[in-house]
Each structure stands twice: as structure tokens, then as C-alpha cells.
């Protein structure tokens, strides 16, 4: 399975460390930016790249992209708390 993750460097780093430990067989592609508007471009690239799903690092970049692009794979975002990546 291939998952796309988009968001800030800081949160992507945490997600990457967690997923490498807990789900080493999962293929993850990262698109990093500290500008929430980049989530739209990242989502479009991920969908063209045939990912199975997209994780946004927060609600702002998720909702911004969702208003402008129709998902063709499952999308979700992480709430802003420390344990959210573990759920």
C-alpha cells in the first residue's frame, strides 16, 4: 500500500519516525511545505501518482484542498494532538 502525507516539515518528521517503527512495510510518500495552500498541489500530485490514500497533517490544509479538488482516494487529516498519529 502506498500512502501520501502532506504538511509541515515538523509534523511530517514525526509521522515518518512513527510509521517507520510501527508500520515498516507501508510505502509512504511525503510532500512537505509549511504553507497550508500547498496541500492542494500535493493532493493533486498524490492522486496522479496512484496512492491508496492521503493524510494531511492538520485540518487547515485538508479543508483548503477539499474545497478545490475532488478526492478520488480516501483523504483524512490528523487532529492537532500528540497521540493522533497513533490512532
Residue ranges of predicted features:
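Alpha-helical/coil-rich non-catalytic "connector" segments in signaling and regulatory proteins
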Residues: 1-87
